[in-house]
Amino acid sequence: MMSQTLTLCCLALVACVYGNTVSTNDTACPTFCPSIYKPVCGTDGQNFKEFASTCNLLSHNCRRERNSVQAYAATDAAWCSSEFVENLHEKLGNFKLEVKECFKPCSMIYQPVCITNGKYRAELANSCLLENFNCALQVSGAQPAELFRLLREEKC
């Protein structure tokens, strides 16, 4: 009698654990995600979307895969949290870019880079200009958290 009760309890536990996921191919698909907000940014190659958690991203992907739509992959959070601006210099208040101590000759080769400071996202013609830009920002009094970093070595 005790072994039957133990077996029944084990089966109930297994059913409870696996009852929250559905499998499509090799991917476990959660049907229930805890209400814990730990945002994750995802991309399907064209669009960026913020999900409440990794679990929500996986669940969303399972529904997309069933419809043969490209799944979202987790990516840098700055893609979802930053505003894309065309003219970064103007957006930041037209600070002085021509600072003697910041001048570093850059090639005229167009190799666009996408940069961000977490708040704004923009494109520069090449990565050398990013160094000059950040130097000029520092001279104008910008805090380290306001400086820009490379998001990817291509257009945004």
Curated annotation (Swiss-Prot):
InterPro entries (UniProt xref): Kazal_dom, Kazal_dom_sf
Domain of life: Eukaryota
Site (Reactive bond): 35-36, 108-109
Keywords: Disulfide bond, Protease inhibitor, Repeat, Serine protease inhibitor, Signal
Keyword Signal: yes
Cysteine pairs bridged by disulfides in the record: 29-62, 33-55, 102-135, 106-128, 114-156
Extent of the signal sequence: 1-19
Record domain Kazal-like: where: 23-81, 96-156
PROSITE patterns associated with the record: KAZAL_2
Gene Ontology MF: a single term: serine-type endopeptidase inhibitor activity
One protein family per Pfam: Kazal_2
Cited SMART domains: KAZAL
Protein name, entry field: Enhancer of split M1 protein
Gene transcribed to yield this protein: Kaz-m1
